[in-house]
Amino acid sequence: MRARLLLLALVTTASLLAAMTAACFGGAVPAPTPRRTATAVATASTARPVAARLPDARVEALLRRAVCWLDDPTSAGTCVPPSPDALAAIDEMGRSGDPRLVAPLIDMLNLDLSWRGPLDAALVRLTGEQSTDARGWREWLLGQGQANAEGPPGYARWKARLLALTATPETKPPYEALFGATLDTSTLAALHWTGVQPDANRPLHDPANVNARAQRYLPPTDLVYGVVIGSEARAYPQRIIAWHGVVNDTLNGHAIVVVHCLPCGGAVAFERGQSGGSTAAGKPRDFGTTGLALHSRSLIFDTVESRLWDGFSGVALGGPGSPGSPRAALTPLPVFTTTWSDWQARHTTTTVLDIATGVVRDYSAGAATRDEVDSTRALHPVQADTRLAEKEPVIGVVPASGPPLAFRLAEVQTRQLVTAGAPGAGVVALSEGPGLAAGVYAAGGVHFVRAEGNGSGFAAIDDAGGRWAMREQALVQVGTGKELPALPWQQGYWFAWAGAHPETEVVRSGTQP
């Protein structure tokens, strides 16, 4: 789907970025030094000027002039098109030589308000670089490490006001509260607006569900994301949750959140009422969508504490504490990505979301994901890691010890059994077969040698001939009931996993059994 927001009826809608985020491993290839995007930016002939930093008061004045500073964001229509004074301020920013102004100029390019030409010229003067588009400038910022530089004074509040230019009389985006004093400058500079207002995708809250036999809209081959807690199983169809981004749900008495990160190519689930998930008051968190992306990973926010979270990794970006302090993290839950028929065969008593969500959407197969699937690149700016293709599907895991690991999903689904680490001492990635469920488990001293069967009849075979059935929460040995615990894995595109875990090692296929 291609979400397009009319900026007060004065912004050209055709220029807005398509998005649907309102709503992510034996021998291994070590993580490299982050790479700059190769084709987005070329060195310009304009030499970068050398100048002293401007006084803070002067920087603040330029930023206010450039974006038509308003106390009432709903009156921002008077800023469009930019006034001669705003354009003069942009030109002065480019000639200033002050590197603190690079990120704000790129932020302004994120919105198409008839100022592309002046902004490009200012950035060329200020950086000595040039780019073909706004995305290229953002990726240059990420790849060159400029996002780690000191930001201008009042940067968080200024960027919140900049994005408020997208507001309408009906919306009051909580950007100022979300950016807050504890969001570090490097993160703030990397935040990219996707063209969608917070909660515009209508997150679901304890949506209605039905038993498997009662549903009438899912064909056997439809993709679902399955979650199991205790004895209860529930399927979250892609065709539904891809529209909404966030599902705040309760399963077997546990408050959970299922996040579909459209740009990341998958869904993840977390506890939202247990350790790390509950609010300071001890209540389950309630999450919404922000319309913001960090390295093309959808960001969500806690609607009670106005706190930003990475919707793919489940890590908080800000909130109580000071910048640089340990960040809170949600407890991840294993998610099986598989077909409806496979899930139903595994869990005959499963429930599934009712198609009657109370929201009018085209819930036909593929409608919500069409634009993302058709794109060969990440939907939004990312920092390149060229060890794998940007949108190579992977299954990632953070073991109890050692670096994060990434398995190529195609290899796991084809081979059905891929190990990492010494026999019996590492982890094992398993799959029922192409297009079916995959998961990662601790080897626990067991040496797995091959896989047999497909679908619900799949079994992993150890070197003593023992058969192990793949379950969401553990590998279970047939006959003895012995269990090897599941490691909370995440399935999505390479860029999403590598961006959240840059120290990741990629499992080498040549060392697998």
Task: Identify the meaning behind each predicted range.
Residues 53-76, 98-109, 131-138:
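Amphipathic alpha-helical scaffolding segments comprising HEAT/armadillo-like alpha-solenoid repeats
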Residues 1-10:
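Bacterial N-terminal signal peptides that target proteins for export
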Residues 47-56, 76-96, 104-107, 117-129:
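Structural detector for internal amphipathic alpha-helices that build alpha-solenoid repeat scaffolds
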